[in-house]
Protein backbone atom coordinates (compact mmCIF):
# COMPACT_ATOMS: atom_id res chain seq x y z
CA UNK A 1 0.00 0.00 0.00
CA UNK A 2 1.26 3.51 -0.82
CA UNK A 3 1.21 5.87 2.17
CA UNK A 4 2.24 9.47 2.68
CA UNK A 5 3.93 10.29 6.01
CA UNK A 6 4.23 13.95 6.99
CA UNK A 7 6.56 14.57 9.93
CA UNK A 8 9.64 12.35 10.19
CA UNK A 9 10.89 13.04 13.71
CA UNK A 10 11.59 10.38 16.34
CA UNK A 11 8.12 8.89 16.06
CA UNK A 12 7.27 9.58 12.41
CA UNK A 13 10.64 8.41 11.14
CA UNK A 14 10.42 5.12 13.03
CA UNK A 15 6.85 4.57 11.89
CA UNK A 16 7.91 5.06 8.27
CA UNK A 17 10.59 2.42 8.77
CA UNK A 18 8.23 -0.06 10.44
CA UNK A 19 5.70 0.33 7.63
CA UNK A 20 8.41 -0.22 5.04
CA UNK A 21 9.55 -3.37 6.82
CA UNK A 22 5.97 -4.62 6.50
CA UNK A 23 6.09 -4.13 2.73
CA UNK A 24 4.31 -0.80 2.39
CA UNK A 25 5.60 1.94 0.09
CA UNK A 26 5.96 5.03 2.28
CA UNK A 27 6.74 8.48 0.89
CA UNK A 28 7.87 10.86 3.61
CA UNK A 29 7.91 14.64 3.83
CA UNK A 30 9.56 16.78 6.50
CA UNK A 31 10.87 20.33 6.72
CA UNK A 32 14.30 18.77 7.31
CA UNK A 33 15.67 18.09 3.82
CA UNK A 34 17.93 15.31 5.11
CA UNK A 35 14.91 13.26 6.24
CA UNK A 36 12.37 13.67 3.47
CA UNK A 37 11.77 11.64 0.32
CA UNK A 38 10.06 14.44 -1.62
CA UNK A 39 10.42 18.20 -1.54
CA UNK A 40 6.78 19.26 -1.24
CA UNK A 41 3.29 18.14 -0.29
CA UNK A 42 2.06 18.16 -3.91
CA UNK A 43 4.88 15.75 -4.81
CA UNK A 44 3.94 13.52 -1.88
CA UNK A 45 0.27 13.37 -2.87
CA UNK A 46 1.18 12.60 -6.47
CA UNK A 47 3.41 9.70 -5.39
CA UNK A 48 0.90 7.78 -3.24
CA UNK A 49 -2.03 6.94 -5.50
CA UNK A 50 -3.51 3.48 -4.76
CA UNK A 51 -5.98 3.02 -7.60
CA UNK A 52 -7.92 6.07 -6.51
CA UNK A 53 -7.25 5.89 -2.74
CA UNK A 54 -4.61 8.14 -1.22
CA UNK A 55 -3.81 7.88 2.50
CA UNK A 56 -1.74 10.52 4.29
CA UNK A 57 -0.58 10.12 7.89
CA UNK A 58 0.13 13.43 9.66
CA UNK A 59 2.70 13.28 12.48
CA UNK A 60 3.51 16.90 13.36
CA UNK A 61 3.06 18.92 16.59
CA UNK A 62 -0.54 19.55 17.57
CA UNK A 63 -2.19 22.93 17.16
CA UNK A 64 -1.25 25.28 14.34
CA UNK A 65 1.26 22.94 12.60
CA UNK A 66 -1.33 20.17 12.36
CA UNK A 67 -4.16 22.44 11.29
CA UNK A 68 -2.01 24.14 8.64
CA UNK A 69 -0.95 20.76 7.25
CA UNK A 70 -4.51 19.44 7.07
CA UNK A 71 -5.68 22.66 5.42
CA UNK A 72 -3.02 22.18 2.74
CA UNK A 73 -4.06 18.56 2.24
CA UNK A 74 -7.69 19.63 1.86
CA UNK A 75 -6.65 21.47 -1.30
CA UNK A 76 -4.59 18.57 -2.67
CA UNK A 77 -6.67 15.47 -1.90
CA UNK A 78 -10.00 14.52 -3.45
CA UNK A 79 -13.15 12.61 -2.57
CA UNK A 80 -12.44 9.15 -1.18
CA UNK A 81 -8.96 9.97 0.11
CA UNK A 82 -8.08 9.66 3.79
CA UNK A 83 -6.14 11.72 6.35
CA UNK A 84 -4.93 10.09 9.58
CA UNK A 85 -3.87 12.48 12.35
CA UNK A 86 -1.42 10.52 14.49
CA UNK A 87 -0.04 13.31 16.65
CA UNK A 88 -1.35 14.45 20.01
CA UNK A 89 -4.15 16.76 18.95
CA UNK A 90 -6.88 17.57 21.45
CA UNK A 91 -10.06 15.69 20.60
CA UNK A 92 -11.96 18.94 20.05
CA UNK A 93 -9.44 19.86 17.34
CA UNK A 94 -10.22 16.55 15.61
CA UNK A 95 -13.86 17.56 15.30
CA UNK A 96 -12.80 20.80 13.60
CA UNK A 97 -10.42 19.06 11.20
CA UNK A 98 -13.03 16.47 10.27
CA UNK A 99 -15.51 19.28 9.59
CA UNK A 100 -12.92 20.86 7.29
CA UNK A 101 -12.46 17.69 5.21
CA UNK A 102 -15.93 16.13 5.26
CA UNK A 103 -17.57 18.55 2.77
CA UNK A 104 -14.96 17.47 0.20
CA UNK A 105 -15.58 13.78 0.82
CA UNK A 106 -12.14 13.30 2.39
CA UNK A 107 -12.11 10.89 5.32
CA UNK A 108 -10.51 11.71 8.67
CA UNK A 109 -9.24 9.44 11.44
CA UNK A 110 -7.60 10.46 14.70
CA UNK A 111 -5.10 7.95 16.03
CA UNK A 112 -3.52 8.09 19.46
CA UNK A 113 -0.11 6.40 19.28
CA UNK A 114 1.82 5.03 22.25
CA UNK A 115 5.16 3.26 22.27
CA UNK A 116 7.69 6.04 21.96
CA UNK A 117 11.08 5.36 20.43
CA UNK A 118 10.69 1.65 21.22
CA UNK A 119 7.76 1.26 18.84
CA UNK A 120 9.95 0.54 15.83
CA UNK A 121 10.84 -2.88 17.22
CA UNK A 122 7.98 -3.54 19.66
CA UNK A 123 5.06 -2.03 17.76
CA UNK A 124 2.75 0.81 18.74
CA UNK A 125 -0.41 0.85 20.80
CA UNK A 126 -3.09 2.44 18.58
CA UNK A 127 -6.35 4.12 19.64
CA UNK A 128 -8.45 5.21 16.66
CA UNK A 129 -11.47 7.44 16.29
CA UNK A 130 -13.54 7.84 13.14
CA UNK A 131 -16.02 6.23 10.78
CA UNK A 132 -15.95 2.45 10.45
CA UNK A 133 -15.52 2.55 6.66
CA UNK A 134 -12.44 4.77 7.00
CA UNK A 135 -10.96 2.52 9.69
CA UNK A 136 -11.39 -0.45 7.35
CA UNK A 137 -9.52 1.36 4.56
CA UNK A 138 -6.57 1.99 6.86
CA UNK A 139 -6.50 -1.39 8.62
CA UNK A 140 -3.45 -2.67 6.66
CA UNK A 141 -1.55 0.32 8.04
CA UNK A 142 -2.72 -0.22 11.61
CA UNK A 143 -1.91 -3.94 11.46
CA UNK A 144 1.64 -3.14 10.35
CA UNK A 145 2.19 -0.60 13.13
CA UNK A 146 0.61 -2.42 16.10
CA UNK A 147 2.48 -5.10 18.11
CA UNK A 148 2.39 -8.68 16.89
CA UNK A 149 -0.34 -10.84 18.37
CA UNK A 150 -4.11 -10.44 18.71
CA UNK A 151 -5.30 -7.19 17.17
CA UNK A 152 -7.34 -6.24 20.24
CA UNK A 153 -4.20 -6.25 22.40
CA UNK A 154 -2.64 -3.35 20.51
CA UNK A 155 -5.44 -1.69 18.58
CA UNK A 156 -8.89 -0.30 19.34
CA UNK A 157 -11.47 1.52 17.26
CA UNK A 158 -12.49 3.61 20.26
CA UNK A 159 -15.44 5.41 18.71
CA UNK A 160 -16.33 8.33 16.49
CA UNK A 161 -13.98 11.12 15.41
CA UNK A 162 -12.12 12.41 18.48
CA UNK A 163 -12.42 9.18 20.48
CA UNK A 164 -8.93 8.00 19.58
CA UNK A 165 -7.20 11.09 20.86
CA UNK A 166 -9.51 11.21 23.88
CA UNK A 167 -8.43 7.66 24.79
CA UNK A 168 -4.76 8.62 24.27
CA UNK A 169 -5.26 11.70 26.47
CA UNK A 170 -6.56 9.56 29.33
CA UNK A 171 -3.74 7.06 28.70
CA UNK A 172 -1.21 9.85 29.21
CA UNK A 173 -3.00 11.03 32.36
CA UNK A 174 -2.64 7.51 33.79
CA UNK A 175 1.02 7.56 32.75
CA UNK A 176 1.59 10.73 34.79
CA UNK A 177 0.25 9.06 37.93
CA UNK A 178 2.19 5.83 37.42
CA UNK A 179 5.48 7.64 36.88
CA UNK A 180 5.00 9.78 39.96
CA UNK A 181 4.16 6.76 42.12
CA UNK A 182 7.44 5.12 41.09
CA UNK A 183 9.25 8.42 41.66
CA UNK A 184 7.89 8.79 45.20
CA UNK A 185 8.85 5.21 46.01
CA UNK A 186 12.36 5.83 44.69
CA UNK A 187 12.80 8.96 46.80
CA UNK A 188 11.64 7.24 49.99
CA UNK A 189 13.92 4.24 49.44
CA UNK A 190 16.87 6.55 48.76
CA UNK A 191 16.14 8.60 51.89
CA UNK A 192 16.25 5.66 54.33
CA UNK A 193 19.72 4.52 55.41
CA UNK A 194 18.53 0.98 56.12
CA UNK A 195 18.09 0.39 52.36
CA UNK A 196 21.51 -0.19 50.79
CA UNK A 197 20.55 -1.15 47.22
CA UNK A 198 17.80 1.06 45.83
CA UNK A 199 18.34 0.12 42.15
CA UNK A 200 18.33 -3.52 43.22
CA UNK A 201 14.90 -3.08 44.80
CA UNK A 202 13.51 -1.67 41.57
CA UNK A 203 15.07 -4.48 39.56
CA UNK A 204 13.72 -7.12 41.95
CA UNK A 205 10.23 -5.70 41.48
CA UNK A 206 10.44 -6.21 37.72
CA UNK A 207 9.56 -9.92 37.87
CA UNK A 208 6.63 -11.50 39.68
CA UNK A 209 5.46 -8.47 41.69
CA UNK A 210 2.17 -6.61 41.43
CA UNK A 211 3.96 -3.35 40.52
CA UNK A 212 5.93 -4.77 37.57
CA UNK A 213 5.47 -2.82 34.34
CA UNK A 214 7.29 -1.47 31.31
CA UNK A 215 7.67 1.88 33.07
CA UNK A 216 9.36 0.09 35.97
CA UNK A 217 11.69 -1.61 33.49
CA UNK A 218 12.57 1.81 32.11
CA UNK A 219 13.22 3.10 35.64
CA UNK A 220 15.67 0.22 36.16
CA UNK A 221 17.36 1.09 32.87
CA UNK A 222 17.61 4.78 33.86
CA UNK A 223 19.26 3.88 37.18
CA UNK A 224 21.71 1.59 35.39
CA UNK A 225 22.69 4.33 32.95
CA UNK A 226 22.77 7.12 35.56
CA UNK A 227 23.45 5.70 39.05
CA UNK A 228 21.72 7.76 41.70
CA UNK A 229 20.35 9.92 38.87
CA UNK A 230 23.50 11.99 39.33
CA UNK A 231 23.35 15.17 37.27
CA UNK A 232 19.71 14.72 36.22
CA UNK A 233 17.76 17.95 36.66
CA UNK A 234 14.46 17.80 38.53
CA UNK A 235 13.00 20.24 35.99
CA UNK A 236 10.15 18.33 34.31
CA UNK A 237 8.04 19.54 31.41
CA UNK A 238 4.57 18.35 30.43
CA UNK A 239 3.07 17.70 27.01
CA UNK A 240 -0.28 19.29 27.85
CA UNK A 241 -2.29 16.09 27.80
CA UNK A 242 -2.18 15.75 31.57
CA UNK A 243 -3.75 19.20 31.82
CA UNK A 244 -6.42 18.29 29.27
CA UNK A 245 -7.23 15.10 31.17
CA UNK A 246 -7.59 17.00 34.43
CA UNK A 247 -9.79 19.60 32.75
CA UNK A 248 -12.02 16.78 31.48
CA UNK A 249 -12.18 15.34 34.99
CA UNK A 250 -13.40 18.69 36.27
CA UNK A 251 -15.90 19.01 33.43
CA UNK A 252 -17.28 15.51 34.06
CA UNK A 253 -17.06 15.74 37.88
CA UNK A 254 -14.69 12.75 37.96
CA UNK A 255 -12.25 13.00 40.91
CA UNK A 256 -8.65 12.71 39.71
CA UNK A 257 -6.47 13.45 42.77
CA UNK A 258 -3.57 11.25 41.63
CA UNK A 259 -3.23 13.01 38.28
CA UNK A 260 -3.62 16.43 39.92
CA UNK A 261 -0.82 15.70 42.40
CA UNK A 262 1.47 14.35 39.66
CA UNK A 263 0.83 17.30 37.36
CA UNK A 264 1.30 19.90 40.10
CA UNK A 265 4.54 18.19 41.14
CA UNK A 266 5.83 18.85 37.62
CA UNK A 267 4.87 22.50 37.96
CA UNK A 268 6.70 22.66 41.30
CA UNK A 269 9.83 21.15 39.73
CA UNK A 270 10.21 24.27 37.59
CA UNK A 271 10.21 26.74 40.48
CA UNK A 272 13.60 27.72 41.79
CA UNK A 273 11.89 29.43 44.69
CA UNK A 274 8.18 28.81 45.22
CA UNK A 275 6.33 32.03 46.13
CA UNK A 276 3.56 29.92 47.66
CA UNK A 277 5.92 28.04 49.98
CA UNK A 278 7.77 31.25 50.81
CA UNK A 279 4.44 32.63 52.00
CA UNK A 280 3.73 29.47 54.04
CA UNK A 281 7.15 29.74 55.72
CA UNK A 282 6.60 33.42 56.48
CA UNK A 283 3.12 32.77 57.89
CA UNK A 284 4.43 29.98 60.15
CA UNK A 285 6.94 32.43 61.48
CA UNK A 286 4.26 35.02 62.13
CA UNK A 287 1.63 32.94 63.91
CA UNK A 288 3.76 30.24 65.49
CA UNK A 289 7.16 31.79 65.97
CA UNK A 290 8.75 29.03 63.87
CA UNK A 291 12.26 29.62 62.51
CA UNK A 292 12.31 30.99 58.95
CA UNK A 293 15.14 29.89 56.63
CA UNK A 294 16.35 32.69 54.36
CA UNK A 295 17.51 32.30 50.74
CA UNK A 296 21.13 33.06 51.64
CA UNK A 297 21.10 30.01 53.91
CA UNK A 298 21.09 31.70 57.30
CA UNK A 299 18.47 30.99 59.92
CA UNK A 300 16.35 34.06 60.59
CA UNK A 301 15.49 32.71 64.03
CA UNK A 302 12.10 32.62 65.64
CA UNK A 303 9.65 35.44 65.28
CA UNK A 304 8.72 37.02 68.60
CA UNK A 305 5.10 36.23 69.37
CA UNK A 306 3.24 39.08 71.09
CA UNK A 307 0.48 37.96 73.41
CA UNK A 308 -2.80 39.79 73.73
CA UNK A 309 -3.50 40.55 70.07
CA UNK A 310 -6.84 38.90 69.38
CA UNK A 311 -7.60 37.35 66.00
CA UNK A 312 -10.04 39.33 63.91
CA UNK A 313 -12.51 36.44 63.70
CA UNK A 314 -14.82 35.51 66.58
CA UNK A 315 -13.05 32.63 68.33
CA UNK A 316 -16.12 31.62 70.34
CA UNK A 317 -18.17 31.59 67.16
CA UNK A 318 -15.57 29.34 65.50
CA UNK A 319 -15.79 26.88 68.38
CA UNK A 320 -19.58 26.84 68.16
CA UNK A 321 -19.36 26.21 64.40
CA UNK A 322 -17.22 23.16 65.13
CA UNK A 323 -20.03 21.61 67.18
CA UNK A 324 -19.02 22.76 70.66
CA UNK A 325 -18.46 25.96 72.56
CA UNK A 326 -16.76 27.32 75.65
CA UNK A 327 -16.66 24.32 77.96
CA UNK A 328 -18.63 22.15 75.50
CA UNK A 329 -17.77 18.79 74.01
CA UNK A 330 -16.46 20.35 70.85
CA UNK A 331 -13.40 21.63 72.70
CA UNK A 332 -11.01 24.25 71.35
CA UNK A 333 -10.89 24.02 67.57
CA UNK A 334 -7.25 25.19 67.68
CA UNK A 335 -6.24 22.21 69.77
CA UNK A 336 -8.14 19.86 67.49
CA UNK A 337 -6.26 21.19 64.48
CA UNK A 338 -2.88 20.68 66.18
CA UNK A 339 0.13 20.86 63.84
CA UNK A 340 1.01 24.39 62.72
CA UNK A 341 -1.54 26.16 64.91
CA UNK A 342 -0.01 24.73 68.07
CA UNK A 343 3.10 26.91 68.08
CA UNK A 344 5.70 27.45 70.83
CA UNK A 345 3.37 29.66 72.85
CA UNK A 346 0.34 27.39 72.77
CA UNK A 347 1.02 25.34 75.88
CA UNK A 348 1.18 21.59 76.11
CA UNK A 349 -2.46 20.72 75.66
CA UNK A 350 -2.44 20.29 71.89
CA UNK A 351 -3.92 17.03 70.64
CA UNK A 352 -2.14 17.38 67.31
CA UNK A 353 0.49 14.70 67.99
CA UNK A 354 3.78 14.04 69.80
CA UNK A 355 5.50 16.79 71.71
CA UNK A 356 8.23 18.57 69.75
CA UNK A 357 11.83 17.63 70.47
CA UNK A 358 12.82 20.82 72.30
CA UNK A 359 9.79 23.02 72.85
CA UNK A 360 7.74 20.77 75.11
CA UNK A 361 4.69 22.53 73.74
CA UNK A 362 3.00 20.24 71.27
CA UNK A 363 4.61 21.68 68.11
CA UNK A 364 4.57 18.73 65.71
CA UNK A 365 5.06 20.41 62.35
CA UNK A 366 7.85 19.57 59.93
CA UNK A 367 9.49 16.75 61.90
CA UNK A 368 10.04 14.47 58.93
What feature does the model see in each segment?
Residues 1-50, 54-55, 117-119, 285, ...:
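NAD(P)+-binding Rossmann beta1-loop-alpha1 motif at the extreme N-terminus of oxidoreductases
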Residues 3, 31-96, 102, 120-130:
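Rossmann-like NAD(P)-binding element
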Residues 22, 104, 252:
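Conserved dinucleotide-binding and phosphotransfer motif residues
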Residues 26, 108-109, 256:
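Hydrophobic beta-strand scaffold residues
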Residues 69, 90-187:
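Rossmann-fold dinucleotide-binding core
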Residues 127, 137, 150-151, 155, ...:
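Helical "substrate-binding/catalytic lid" subdomain
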Residues 300, 309, 315-318, 335-345, ...:
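Short linear motifs in low-complexity or flexible loops
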Amino acid sequence: MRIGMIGLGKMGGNMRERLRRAGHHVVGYDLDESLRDVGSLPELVEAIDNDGLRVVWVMVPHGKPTRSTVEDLAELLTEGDLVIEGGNSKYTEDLELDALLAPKGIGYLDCGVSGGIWGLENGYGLMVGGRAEDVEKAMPIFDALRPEGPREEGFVHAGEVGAGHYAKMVHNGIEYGLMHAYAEGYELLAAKDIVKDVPGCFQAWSRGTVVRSWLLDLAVKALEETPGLEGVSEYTTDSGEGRWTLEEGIEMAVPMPVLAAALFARFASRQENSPAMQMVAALRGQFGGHAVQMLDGHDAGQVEVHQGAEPKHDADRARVDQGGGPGGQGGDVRAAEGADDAGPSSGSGSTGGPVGPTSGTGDVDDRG
